[in-house]
């Protein structure tokens, strides 16, 4: 993303009074436990418990959690205006009781937590013939995020420009900066006339999450950048707050086969009591925000916990732009297609909402939309693939401004009780409201009558 586009984003977000770009009074306040400070000029051998003795790295924080030094009730704060590489993919070793908080201290811009691996070593590349260059993604061949050895690359970023065309064999590479990643052998191959690392600031994302949330967790006032999987995933945990963060440059890694994925904030079925508020989310391969997932009705093996549904999940006052979709909902029974539980009081999605969010440019200027194999399912604000479980969800008070394809993608046969109303919808003249239906924005009254959606919403045609 160029500097000018970054400025445009900041200006647009600043126009929204509900969204806080730079925190000050909202910074992490010391909890009853210990506060740990992280700064670029810190020392991982220091105490870490004061601004004058900060630690330096994400890896130190992860190590301290696994060693039982950082426990529940503690607060971890990163210095504003500074950059830290790594990710918090596995916090399962966290001990104790109470809330764990990740936040910021000092003044200036939000601290940047980057998942990028930086490919700044030309000597690490090997030309394997023609314009094909290969690098082994092993220690010593890159800098930046060393928290993971994953080699499932999501996209390349060269001098702030996205390059997301991923091929599934080396032989398919034909054009500049197309790439193939071999996860098993940890090998990345890139089509380039010159050594890729000599062309500028080259970075890659790899699979994972910047934060895999745990129960009773607050993530606030951070700038989370660069991951091939999700920005934040909430799965089988409760009591999670995601507040006033910026989440960007997310997705593109392979989920299975040739299917790529990656969401800004994903609440997977089983996550409950979640608040996602006042965040800025942009440049995501798939969807900015979502509640989704399969039930687990029998435990064992890779299914250690029962999973019936999610409740009390709320997305509000977020600013979303340049994602393939803004909000997605789908829920289903077990993956083995056995009988779903639709009668339990905890089944499906209960008492959830998507309210007062400002969503614009769905699929417009979106790197993910440009490279996805199913573009008709992107470029929409609202997306629903399946509604096989009970859904109690309200989508109200939002602004949905401009989309590449349509306002929503939803199968007409779905009949769950989703309440969608009192929104502002702005599309281009002649643009469809729903991909699977014929009504255009000019025919919104007929569409609302047929679907039951947005009867009291405001529809405008973009000038």
Model-derived regions: residue spans:
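Low-complexity, acidic Ser/Thr/Pro-rich repeat tracts that form intrinsically disordered stalk/linker regions
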Residues: 29-32
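Extracellular beta-strand/beta-solenoid scaffold signature
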Residues: 120, 124-140, 175-176, 204-209, ...
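Extracellular polysaccharide-degrading/modifying enzymes targeting complex plant/algal/animal polysaccharides
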Residues: 35-235, 253-258, 267, 300-302, ...
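Leucine-rich solenoid repeat modules
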Residues: 401-405, 409-412, 418-439
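N-terminal export signals
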Residues: 7-27
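Acidic/polar loop patches that form or flank catalytic/metal-binding clefts of enzymes
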Residues: 365-368, 406-408, 431-436, 455-460
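N-terminal export leaders
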Residues: 3-9, 107
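Right-handed parallel beta-helix
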Residues: 215-226, 238-253, 261-264, 271-326, ...
